[in-house]
Every structure is written in structure tokens, then in C-alpha cells.
Amino acid sequence: LCRTEHMFFEGDRIKAVREMILADDEAGRRVALAKLLPMQRSDFEGLFKAMQGHPVTVRLLDPPLHEFVPHFEKEQRELAKDMNVPYEKIAAKVELLAEVNPMLGHRGCRLGNTYPEITEMQTRAIIEAAMNVKKTGIPVHVEIMVPLVGNHKELRYQKNIIDQTAEKVFSERNDRLEYMVGTMIEVPRAAVTAHQI
């Protein structure tokens, strides 16, 4: 199981993640996500090569966005300076992202459903990486896990985004690749409705 959020905390990556979080609109988020795409693709290529044909389950972004932003004023001021935005904007966004119950809040598939461009970027990175590695003669078995699904509609919505994005990549490259999409039953609602999921 590859938890993709751990890839986001290093150097330039955390900066791009924070740019995405602080973006005012989808266009701004897409600009930041475009910076993350080659980093994610490279990570997945390394992973698929190392696994030498063994199945790899890649879990899409799971934690709430507040985990990626600084919570103390000093660090928020440093971030504001680094990003050339007013400190007040950073402080307001951090306050807006605060979760009462971060274990069940705006995270997992709900984050991907609110911001489908995140799911699109991660799917593109996974599929492109798998196809690149496959071209070298190494078999690749990709399993994409949608996190924190509570009902079948959430999974269906995310699967549609994943499938549409994969089809775009297949069309661009005039090649195809088998992959699976699934979830983990990890919340009570998912257990109760598992027969639908």
C-alpha cells in the first residue's frame, strides 16, 4: 500500500501543495497540481520498477488539507513571505481548514469529490508512470484505492474521474493498461453499505 500523502511533505512538493490549498479557484489549483504531476509520476515510476510486477495499491490523497499548512503564527508569516501573499490570507485559510473531527471531516474521497482536479492529477501520474515502466519491459499491476468511502455514490463518482482520466492518457499515448479501482472498508457507514460498494 502506497500512501501518497507522504510524498507531499518534501521541499518543493509541500510548497506546491500549499499553493494548491491557498489557490482562490480551480485554475489556481490546477497550476499548482501541474507542478506536482511530474514529481508524483517520478515517485510512482520508482515504485513500480522496484516492485517488479508485484501488485501495487496506490491510495489517493487521504488526509484533510489542514495537515499541510502551518498552524503557528510564526510559520504562517514565513509562508506568507515565501508565497508573497498577505499573512491574513494564510491565517484565514488555515482557520477555514480547521476540522472539528479530522478523522471524518473533509478528507479522503470527499476531498477528491470537492476538488476532482486532485484525483485527476494523481490518476494521470499513476497511469503515466505505469505505462512508462511497462514500456521498459517490467510488468505493472496497478490498483488505485479511493480512501474513506462511506457509500457507493462516493466511490462511483471517484471511479468515473479515474476512468475518464485514464482514458485520456490512453488516447494521448495510443496504448492501454489494465488497472483496478477499489476502496477499503474503513468507516462504519461503508461497513453497513458494503454490499452496495
What residue ranges belong to the model's regions?
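Conserved alpha/beta-domain cores
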Residues: 1-197
